[in-house]
Design a protein with these regions (language model features):
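Short, Lys/Arg-rich flexible segments
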Residues: 1-101
Length: 101
């Protein structure tokens, strides 16, 4: 049986990139600080031989923008990125598993 670890890790990294790009694209911009603070970090767990992606921001007001607060309506941008990756998951994994990436 073939080991698909490399293909799975590549698909995870691609989905992380999709989520990052969509979060950046849909991030509300007033000064641009929030949008510039969005980062994508890929991590590799050697014990599991598995990649993971973390997308986020360290701007203190990011949760108030994402979820709303104090009379402000939510303006999700990280959730938009997650949703874009979720919608692409089956397609991306099928392409990488077939070798069509």
């Amino acid at each position: 049986m073939k080991d698909y670890t490399n293909e799975i890790n590549a698909a995870v990294r691609t989905l992380g990139d999709i989520a990052f790009k969509e979060a950046s694209r849909t991030c509300p911009v007033r000064t641009g600080r929030l949008k510039r603070s969005i980062t994508l970090r890929t991590q590799h767990d050697r014990a599991k031989n598995a990649d993971s992606c973390v997308i986020g921001t360290t701007v203190p007001y990011a949760p108030n923008v994402e979820f709303g607060g104090r009379g402000r309506h939510p303006k999700p941008f990280l959730e938009n990125g997650l949703e874009a990756a979720r919608k692409s998951t089956v397609l991306i994994f099928s392409l990488f598993m077939k070798g069509d990436q």
